[in-house]
Each structure stands twice: as C-alpha cells, then as structure tokens.
C-alpha cells in the first residue's frame, strides 16, 4: 500500500511532527507502532528540562528513521521579495507574519 500525504508543522517544536507516530494519534495514518517510541514521546511531552526533552525526541526520531513508516519526498519552501521600504517584516520558521507590525519608510 502507498499513500501520499502532507503535514505542515502547527508550532515550532519537534513534537508537531514526532507525535504523528504515536500509536493512537488520529493522524497516524500508517498505523505504525513501536513499543519504545510512544513512551519516549510521552516522556518528552512531560519533561520541563529542554536538554532532556531534546534527547528523548532524538532517541524517538532514531527509532522512527530506522523503521521508516513514512518516506519524506519533499518539503515546502517559500520565497518572498520584500521591498526595502517595508519595515517590521521578518522571516518565520512557521511562515506566519504579523502584518499589523509592517510599516513603510
């Protein structure tokens, strides 16, 4: 079986992508499951220490990559031409921009 799908991160955090592999996640369309993966993601969600959280996500990602339940084939890229007279615009990882902060010189 093969399926093509797309996902754009809802927020700037590894969990926005890695939580998709959790067994009972409604967006886990592959029905993939791994006994060590789910607890790692759950621990990372509860952990306050950023370094520990990063390590947990890193370990979970290694499992995901070794199993390859999904195969990324492309990623979104956005190009913008911003006139130098526009101020208050800045690039954003989530491609969201507070246009109320824009101004013209």
Can you say where each PLM-predicted feature lies in the sequence?
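Extracytoplasmic/secreted proteins, especially bacterial periplasmic and envelope-associated proteins
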Residues: 13, 36-43, 52-59, 63
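Periplasmic binding protein-like
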Residues: 1-24, 56
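Bilobed periplasmic-binding protein-like "clamshell/Venus-flytrap" ligand-binding domains
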Residues: 3-6, 48-84
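Short, solvent-exposed loop/beta-turn-alpha elements that line the ligand-binding surface or hinge
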Residues: 16-46, 75-105
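Selective for proline/serine-rich intrinsically disordered segments
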Residues: 12, 67-70, 89, 96
């Amino acid at each position: 079986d093969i399926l093509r799908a797309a996902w754009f991160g809802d927020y700037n955090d590894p969990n926005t992508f890695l939580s998709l592999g959790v067994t009972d996640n409604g967006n886990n369309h592959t029905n993939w499951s791994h006994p060590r993966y789910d607890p790692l993601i759950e621990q990372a969600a509860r952990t306050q220490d950023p370094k520990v959280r990063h390590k947990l996500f890193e370990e979970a990602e290694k499992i995901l990559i070794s199993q390859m339940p999904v195969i990324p084939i492309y990623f979104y890229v956005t190009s913008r031409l911003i006139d130098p007279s526009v101020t208050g615009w800045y690039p954003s990882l989530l491609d969201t921009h507070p246009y109320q902060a824009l101004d013209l010189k």
